[in-house]
Amino acid sequence: MARPIILSNGEMHVGINRSGLVHDFYYPYVGGENHAEAHNLQHRVGVWVDDRFSWLSSDDWEVTFSYVPETLIGVVTAVQHDLGIMLEMTDAVDAEQAAFLRNIHVVNLAENARDIRLFMHQNFIISNSYASDTVQYLPDEHVLVHYKGPRSFVIGGSTSDAKTFDQYTAGLNGIEGFEGSYRDAEDGELSNHAVEHGRVDSVVRFSLSLAAHDSSRVYYWIAAGKSHREALRIHHKILDDGPLHRLLATATHWRQWLSRAQPTAAALPERYRDGFLRSVLLVKAHIDKRGAVIASTDTTMLNYSRDTYAYCWPRDAAFALWPLIRLGYTDEALSFFGFCRRVLSGHGYLMHKYTPDGALGSSWHPYRQRDGYEAPPIQEDETAIVVFLFAHYYTLHRDDKLLREFYPTMIEPMANFLASYVDEEGLPRPTYDLWERLFLTSTYTTAITYAALTEAARLAEAYGDQAASVRWQTAAEAMQGVAQHVLFDTERQALVKGVRRDPDATVVDTTIDASSAYGAYMFGLYAADSHEVAQSFATIDRVLKTSDYHPGLARFENDEYNRFDPTRVGNPWYITVLWRAQYHLECGQADRATALIDWVNGQMTTTGMLAEQFDPDTLQSISVLPLTWSQAEYVSCLLDLLHSEKRT
């Protein structure tokens, strides 16, 4: 499960699969409508030469991946030795408009001159629905257009000598006995069928004549719009500017955007710099321009599971934005705060997760528990961490205009909810834990809620709302006092997973959970050097260890999610390893921290990506790749490393 290349501009987002083919195509929201969201919806690339044909998806091709340094421009190199062909595809989503660009360098590796035909296949499921798509050839424009309703995709291209595609076809795909129009390409010729509707695909052909060891280029693009007119306008812009110019402009855009992170990267040890900058870019790639931050756009798992990660969890978003704020980026956080304010419930809390347009995402959390207890199906930590993040942003920028705008409309209702949604002793009432599994008052949620109320009190004071400041600070202190009496298990020498107060008793869940120790010190519920936190991490090292040969740590005991071996504690996650490194840094143990960071650094893919979790034996990536949170936690850990060096 992987997308070794992802490309984005905050409106269009494209995922390239392990065969070098387009396999996720989001527009007009990052993480929203995926017009290529199915196992068989990859956009194929094929080559015909010497009366032989091969698709890149076959095992005969050797495919490698990289990025152009300091950009979100991907490079796919595909070699077929038997055919004597190499394709070098430089891919980008145009930084300024909704267009996917491929600069395809076609190389003849043979000792003789040859005619080579390159076939580009389009296979959309527009707006996530197979019904009622249309593909047409537009003779006046010499393009193909796939469309349905307010979505149009114009297919254009040219060779390096300014010739466009010389054949095309439109056909049915996976319906009425038709496999797809891509089959029409396999004899090297296309039928020029000009229209089809229903479940459709299309192919265009570019013809090249290359001398021995010669090469040429094919420029290919998909321009998207909410109408034919808009998509054609972008198509004409590419023609007028030239596709190479659009690629160069996109490279310039990303290098300018990344310049804010460059001084920090330069201060890091050299072995971390590429991974640091790549992770910053990968976080940015998952941010929709209207504020949502998507957990992952890799939809490979949709073919095996019920859903994808293409949602905005406020928690994941906050962890993704935290290092960007520390680096001095502002636009992304401000857009996210606006997103949160728009989706905030009338009761002052955020829901489980959202689609990038602000609609409620799918959920498995009920309003009524099995014992009849009724409560909103939320994770309270997701509301709390937004307050915490906003306060962090305000502390850095002291933007009083921003505070005046967001205090009454977001901070005050959120903090009022956090302060009031407590039990008779002052602890947060039960909600779902950050892992989305258990309904209880978790240590992690208590910690971030305490921190949020403390920060909200400071924001209230800055705003001039003294009564709210006192009220929220009082609630925070009461919460901390109770927590420090009930959340540590002296028998297991660890902070507990959480508590659930039933009518007759308080039930304590003593499961060892990495988030309990991390949250307790990171958000100030306990001092980092306290006995409770130190012993908790020692217990975590012992209980959640997944191997004697690497430092991988599971999230919690008996974590069944994607676990292959039921005798193991669970799969290790990258964020838990990085949390451990951050605590070492907090304790002044830089050598132990860098050993963990070095190990994570070595597990990155060739394109700098980290998955959600990995196999404890083979170290192969499991679940989505990349996971935005994993990339962000890597950046945060390196920022902590620099901070720790400044303290010493």
Q: Model segments located where?
A:
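Short Pro-Gly-centered flexible turn/kink motifs
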Residues: 65, 114, 208-229
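Helix-terminus loop motifs that line ligand-binding clefts
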Residues: 65-70, 75-77, 292-302, 311-312, ...
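Low-complexity, Ser/Thr/Pro/Gly-enriched N-terminal "stalk/linker" regions
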Residues: 1-9, 181, 228-230, 243-312, ...
